[in-house]
Amino acid sequence: MSLKEKVHAVFQNSFGCEPDLYVRAPGRVNLIGEHTDYNDGFVLPCAIDYETVVALQRRDDDKVVVVAADYANQRDEFSLSQPIEAHADQLWSNYIRGVVKYLLEKGLSLKGLNMVVSGNVPQGAGLSSSASLEVAIGQAFNDAYQLGLTPAAIALNGQEAENKFVGCNCGIMDQMISASGEKDHALLLDCRSLQTRLVKMPDDLAVLIVHSNVKRGLVDSEYNTRRAQCESAARYFGVKALRDVTLEQLQQAAEQGKLEPVVYQRARHVITENERTLAAADALETGDLEKMGVLMAESHNSMRDDFAITVPAIDTLVEILQQHIGNDGGARMTGGGFGGCVVALLRPAQVDDVIAAVEAEYPAKTGLKPTCYVCKASDGAGIF
């Protein structure tokens, strides 16, 4: 049963009628550009064909009624005319409440909706299931009430909900790619200006995401530490963010003993990762998969050695993928670190053999079982 069929059936059961509209918003994978977003840098994600789908019906009053088809049809109801508070027991509700709260704060004219929500973005895998939900809800209100919001406005509203209402300090990348992705393209995003450039992906290219199934500990505290180290390096140079520092300036400061070695390493990752991300957009566009593979390997090594956010099982998984893909693509860890997923780019003809190799070798070397997702670069949010 497709997601659309699922939300349709649950909608009929819950509300006894047909929905007015269906909207969708995808998850994402970041091909390269890690921990650069909060440093005002560049990222190169693509939307994937795992998504959140909403069936909706306009209401004449100010009540929002949501049914979560993936959580045993749990319901949430709240009013647009009362202060929107966090739900004490249902975490999923807060992503929706937060999005609606910040739409209202922008002075937009909303009425209520009946909604059924379902998604197949793997949770806890670093593929942005939460951003997909936030963007889907923003898109639902935008399309139901002709709010005229741009994809960037829907993305920023979702980020605001996650930062302020849910309490997770994410950058803008996840919501932005979910809102504005395009089929068969990656999106080069400047996280400072929010300018985007669509990057055509080669036709004969597969995106393989492998979940390491490493239990992730320390992610939040380590993330905050890395962020603070990057900010202290930017402060030393008197700039807003590491985006404004060159590698030459950084090396000069290090040679003069002006930076702690660990801060130097963290900053070196960010500065070189920005350079790699810009180069990767060009390599992808020209179909130079060998160059793309080199850049992905350099990115992974930098995350391992300078930013110190990989773990041994992830390094092993990347090595297995690199070995079996060869020179026609590459692999690297993607996401915040300390577990999560590896992203690989390879020829479609290689996919089955590479998955078989990963499923044989990774458990033998780590005792962990991988989960593989073969994806296509997909369209961003919209009605369907």
Curated annotation (Swiss-Prot):
The active site is at D174. It catalyses: alpha-D-galactose + ATP = alpha-D-galactose 1-phosphate + ADP + H(+). Keywords: ATP-binding, Carbohydrate metabolism, Cytoplasm, Galactose metabolism, Kinase, Magnesium, Metal-binding, Nucleotide-binding, Transferase. The record marks R28 as: Transition state stabilizer. ATP binds at G124, A125, G126, L127, S128, S129, S130. It is found in: Cytoplasm. One of its GO terms (molecular function) is galactokinase activity. It is an enzyme of class 2 (transferase). Its EC number is 2.7.1.6. One of its GO terms (cellular component) is cytosol. Pathway: Carbohydrate metabolism; galactose metabolism. InterPro entries: Galactokinase (IPR000705), Galactokinase_bac (IPR022963), Galactokinase_CS (IPR019741), GalKase_N (IPR019539), GHMP_kinase_C_dom (IPR013750), GHMP_kinase_C_sf (IPR036554), GHMP_kinase_N_dom (IPR006204), GHMP_knse_ATP-bd_CS (IPR006203). Substrate binds at E34, H35, T36, D37, Y223. Mg(2+) binds at S130, E162. One of its GO terms (biological process) is galactose metabolic process. HAMAP family: Galactokinase. Catalyzes the transfer of the gamma-phosphate of ATP to D-galactose to form alpha-D-galactose-1-phosphate (Gal-1-P). This is Galactokinase. It comes from Tolumonas auensis (strain DSM 9187 / NBRC 110442 / TA 4).
